[in-house]
Amino acid sequence: EVGIPSQAKEAIAFAILASCTLDNEPGNVPSVTGASARAVLGSITPAPLQRAAAPRNALVPSAVPADRSSLLTEQRLPESMSLDSMPLNEALDLMSSQDQQAVAAVRSQHAEIATLIEIVADRLHRGGRLFYCGAGTSGRLGVLDAAECSPTFRTDPQMVQAIIAGGEGAVFAAIEGAEDDTQAGAAAIEIRNIGPSDVLIGIAAGGTTPFVIGALAAARNQKAATALICCVKPTASEPPVDVVIRPLTGPEVLTGSTRLKAGTATKLILNTISTLAMVRLGKVHENLMVDLRATNQKLWDRGARLVALLTGLQRESALELLRSADGSVKIAVLMQRGRLTSQEAQAALAKSGGALRVALELNAEKR
């Protein structure tokens, strides 16, 4: 630092942060800039979430907002018109009965969901990536599902990712106006180099979110496979995609609050897509998550129990075997049942495309 002007040091620091951001690697250089927050989606040093509220007129739209009153998700539910004065037990029964409609709505979309699962599994098998994209509740649901794939299925963190309008901070608090930025949605696709080998699933309960529409259009331009999950009937503004999953959950108990039935249906759909796509990638044996990543005590325990279940070993011996297999349930099972070394088990698993069932069958044929 000796002899370097402060302006030059500041310029260098901001160049580093900008580079990290463009590479989609949030960074922070507190020793140089004094920043306490990481760089997020183009913001060099984003403001802390505890900042004072913006002036009231800052949130007033510059243009007349589109009239969304015709959307199914914006309608009033007759059964909940007296929600504010309804006895608690009655309100509980009402919400529970309405939640059942979310399940039924998902069931009505099984054909479309199956089509999308096949597309996702094919692209992932060929080395592509799956992206969820949404704003608000829809974006957070994508984050939830993407975050669970690595520990559950031992996937590379890059394989399944989530894009949320407003960036990382929007996971924890509303970022006003972020969902209205179509260009930001398109930029999110460009910065991640999404292309023909990838899949983008847009999530928008009302089907009109500009950020999601911009992202889908950009992904489609790059020849990526695209899909939309929405809870309304077709509209003129609906973007063209390869697959539309349309669970019509109907009006919400709390009018317009799509974190309720629409959110429930969306979570069920994302659960189904990721789980069954991973089954097709050989990451499940029987109904067991044999590709789990043992990152904590709970998962080491579960892994040991899986090894014991599939080999007949006692828990202590299974845990020792799992450790020798570097935490891989598949390798541990192949070592025990196939009488293989760790290296031989890895080779057998690679030959079978990662499917434990196939690897066990091939090894049995050799003996």
What is each model feature region?
Residues S108-H125:
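A short, well-structured juxtamembrane/interface segment
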Residues T272, A277-R367:
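Short, amphipathic alpha-helical interaction segments embedded in low-complexity terminal/linker regions
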Residues T73-E74, L94-A102, A162-A173, H285, ...:
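Gly-rich Lys/Arg/Thr-decorated short loops/hinges at beta-loop-alpha junctions or inter-strand turns
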Residues F131-I269, S274-L281:
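Glycine-rich phosphate-binding loops that contact phosphosugars or nucleotide phosphates
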Residues V2-Q50:
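Glycine-rich phosphate-binding/hydrolytic loop that grips phosphoryl groups
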Residues S6, R76, P251-S257, G282-Q297:
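Conserved Rossmann-fold dehydrogenase catalytic segment
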Residues L59-A105, Q109:
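Cofactor-/ligand-binding subdomain signature composed of acidic, glycine-rich
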Residues S31-L59, A294-K298, N363-K366:
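A short, charged, Gly/Pro-tolerant segment at domain boundaries
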